[in-house]
């Protein structure tokens, strides 16, 4: 074994001990006794409060809308991030967020009426709080780990009796199917922020006249987003379309690391304004939602951009199949679909309108109200 491999393995082993030791030392893995006193002080525990995180931003949106409904919110860093840095990151993600930011070591176990875990490691840390224990689930995390310690510990978090509230129904069905759930489990609708991505009416007939097809492609350094497969598919598609007289302009966004193959424009991480401009400039938007759906297709649909998703993902769990192009792993299938809609722009417009109509009733305000309705149905203990 070379020195580099030894260093990587030693670092990974040390980091795992940091994660696992407090769990094994402090958790007895018994089902929690979960009693709610009816109060409105909510603590939300995150590993870190970081910039440019969709998951963190969703938590801030939920918390802010709960604050508007009369709840007192505190966002807590499990790893004791600097308070000033937390506030800066929160403002970066959501400039008008409401609530307080604190490191875990500045909280006490009696500070809250409700304590909410947001990631598998945070579940074990909220056990010390004298509060109603909830688990806000944005994805089924065991999927991300190979079978072993991390997989087992993450899977166990759904079996400890916390009140689970999922962002969307897919997580609920997956957790129930995969785990021995002991506590209450509910979900709120997967929303989007309407004020940031307004619908722009397009002249779809123009696409029939153009020989250049522009696509906005979401890539991220996470396997569930297919950061290697998507560029490879598009590389073959680009070469094939060129033989048919079409130029494919690929605009990658969301990536911090270089794309695996040089076949497009690497936009990196974009602001919301830049994203909306990109969506308006492109003819199609492409994203992979293999586990719980990404927020990105909602944004694209809201802006009026036709969406390309994957048959093997969860898009059709949230939307009808008639609202997007669902491709497989073959560039030939994707090419056939794109050329069909280029030749039939009226159908592309109808698909886009159908997709947009399906999200009109969604909002963070509505989802926050659903969260409150869930709390209203919990039996309270004085």
Kindly give the residue locations of the regions a language model identified.
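Conserved acidic donor-binding segment of nucleotide-sugar-dependent glycosyltransferases
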Residues: 321-332, 340-345
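Membrane-proximal helix-turn-helix segments that form the acceptor-binding/catalytic region
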Residues: 104-105, 147-165
């Amino acid at each position: 074994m070379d020195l580099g491999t030894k260093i990587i393995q030693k670092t990974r082993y040390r980091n795992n001990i940091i994660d696992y030791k407090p769990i094994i030392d402090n958790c007895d893995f018994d089902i929690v006794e979960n009693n709610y006193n009816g109060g409105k002080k909510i603590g939300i525990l995150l590993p870190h409060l970081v910039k440019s995180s969709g998951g963190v931003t969703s938590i801030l949106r939920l918390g802010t809308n709960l604050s508007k409904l009369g709840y007192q919110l505190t966002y807590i860093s499990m790893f004791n991030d600097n308070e000033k840095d937390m506030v800066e990151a929160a403002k970066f993600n959501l400039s008008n967020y409401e609530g307080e930011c604190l490191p875990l070591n500045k909280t006490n176990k009696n500070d809250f009426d409700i304590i909410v875990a947001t990631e598998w490691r945070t579940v074990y840390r909220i056990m010390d709080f004298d509060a109603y224990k909830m688990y806000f689930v944005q994805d089924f995390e065991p999927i991300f780990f190979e079978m072993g310690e991390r997989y087992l510990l993450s899977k166990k978090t759904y079996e400890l009796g916390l009140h689970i509230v999922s962002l969307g129904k897919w997580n609920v069905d997956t957790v129930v199917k995969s785990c021995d759930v002991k506590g209450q489990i509910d979900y709120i609708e997967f929303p989007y922020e309407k004020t940031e991505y307004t619908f722009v009416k397009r002249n779809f007939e123009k696409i029939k006249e153009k020989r250049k097809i522009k696509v906005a492609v979401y890539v991220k350094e996470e396997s569930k987003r297919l950061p290697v497969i998507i560029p490879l598919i598009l590389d073959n598609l680009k070469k094939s379309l060129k033989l048919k007289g079409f130029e494919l302009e690929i605009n990658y966004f969301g990536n911090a690391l270089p794309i695996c193959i040089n076949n497009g424009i690497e936009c990196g991480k974009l602001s919301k304004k830049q994203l909306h401009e990109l969506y308006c400039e492109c003819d199609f938007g492409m994203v992979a939602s293999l586990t719980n759906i990404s927020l990105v297709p909602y944004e694209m649909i809201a802006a009026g951009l036709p969406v390309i998703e994957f048959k093997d993902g969860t898009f059709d769990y949230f939307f009808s199949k008639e609202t997007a192009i669902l491709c497989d792993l073959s560039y030939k299938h994707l090419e056939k679909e794109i050329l069909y809609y280029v030749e039939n722009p009226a159908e592309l417009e109808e698909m886009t309108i159908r997709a947009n109509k399906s999200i009109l009733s969604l909002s963070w305000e509505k989802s926050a109200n659903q969260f409150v309705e869930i709390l209203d149905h919990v039996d309270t203990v004085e």
